[in-house]
Amino acid sequence: MAVPKKRTSISKKLIRKNFWKKRGYWTALKAFSLAQSIFTGNSKSFFCNK
């Protein structure tokens, strides 16, 4: 017999959502930092021809 699952609380839902938002923020920050270092020519980990 099928039993309905318990409802996920709002606080737990927000915690999970914020985790994903924070992860996206740090990834974007890292990408922006890499782009800045490439643009200024200070990159040591990324090689590109100018």
Curated annotation (Swiss-Prot):
Organism of provenance: Lotus japonicus
Descriptive protein name: Large ribosomal subunit protein bL32c
Record carries keyword Plastid: yes
Gene Ontology biological process terms, A to Z: translation
Keywords (A to Z) from UniProt: Chloroplast, Plastid, Ribonucleoprotein, Ribosomal protein
Family under the similarity heading: Belongs to the bacterial ribosomal protein bL32 family.
Main location: plastid
A molecular function GO annotation: structural constituent of ribosome
One GO cellular component, as annotated: chloroplast
Localization in the cell: Plastid, Chloroplast
